[in-house]
Every structure is written in structure tokens, then in C-alpha cells.
């Protein structure tokens, strides 16, 4: 038998976007709502602050260039992992993959934003990308669930 130490997994789920990114952290490996902490960025003043004990909204920082915007967004994620949850070790990071529904210039900005986050994360954490249909299937039972069902 081992020394009795149990290595608890810290599971990190990231739904990364330009306008409303969110991070969910389960500090004990559980999947119940009460086992998790939820963080999100918003531009709406009424959604900033502690909504529930484990749900906290942060305001987007001002930015002057796309790179500054992407750096702010990825920095916010790293702040959550490194500062708010620094005690939790053994972090397993999962990022929802691209949905491919965007068009035009947004496609490039979404890709650049995601690339910067993944680059910064992979320097310190093991990251895995999960395709949106798998996330939807786990959450609703249907891989093609719409936003309302999610």
C-alpha cells in the first residue's frame, strides 16, 4: 500500500473566446456544481463581481491592438491558474476546440488568440484540446446541441 497520500487532480476547463471566455476549475476532480469554481470575462457591468460563492465575473481590460487584447485574455487565464488556484497542483487543462462557425477577419483573430493562450499554457501545463461536439455530448447527451441547450 502507498504512503496514504492521495494525489487529487485539479481539472481545468477553458471555453476560450474573444468576448466571453470562461474557466471552470474542479479542485477535487468532482463534476458537481459545488465542486467547481467558475470565472468569466464580461463587458456588462451587471455581471461583474461575485454572482455566487463559486461564480465570479471579471471586467475586460482596455486594449489598443489585437495582440494586447490576446495578451490580456491569456494573462487573465494564467492569473486564475497561478494566483487564485496556485495551491492546487497536478492541473489537467482542457480547452474547447474551435467551432469553425466564424467568418472573415474573425477567423484569424480567434486562431491567433487561441494560439497565444495555448503557447503560454503549454510552457507549464499539459493541455488537451476537446472538440466542441464532445463537450456538447457530455453536457447534454447530444453532440449537436445548440447554445440554448448548453
Language model features with spans:
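Phosphate- and other anionic-substrate recognition elements at nucleic-acid/protein interfaces
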Residues: 2-150
Amino acid at each position: 500500500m502507498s504512503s496514504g497520500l492521495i494525489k487529487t487532480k485539479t481539472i481545468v476547463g477553458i471555453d476560450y473566446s474573444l468576448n466571453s471566455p470562461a474557466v471552470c476549475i474542479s479542485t477535487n476532480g468532482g463534476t458537481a456544481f459545488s465542486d467547481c469554481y467558475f470565472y468569466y470575462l464580461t463587458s456588462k457591468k451587471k455581471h461583474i463581481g461575485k454572482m455566487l460563492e463559486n461564480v465570479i465575473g471579471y471586467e475586460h481590460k482596455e486594449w489598443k491592438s489585437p495582440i494586447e487584447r490576446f495578451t490580456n485574455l491569456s494573462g487573465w487565464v494564467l492569473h486564475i491558474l497561478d494566483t487564485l488556484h496556485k495551491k492546487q497542483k497536478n492541473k489537467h487543462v482542457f480547452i474547447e476546440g474551435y467551432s469553425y462557425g466564424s467568418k472573415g477577419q474573425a477567423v484569424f483573430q480567434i486562431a491567433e488568440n487561441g494560439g497565444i493562450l495555448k503557447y503560454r499554457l503549454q510552457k507549464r501545463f499539459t493541455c488537451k484540446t476537446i472538440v466542441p461536439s464532445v463537450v456538447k455530448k457530455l453536457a447534454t447527451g447530444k453532440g449537436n446541441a445548440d447554445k440554448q441547450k448548453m
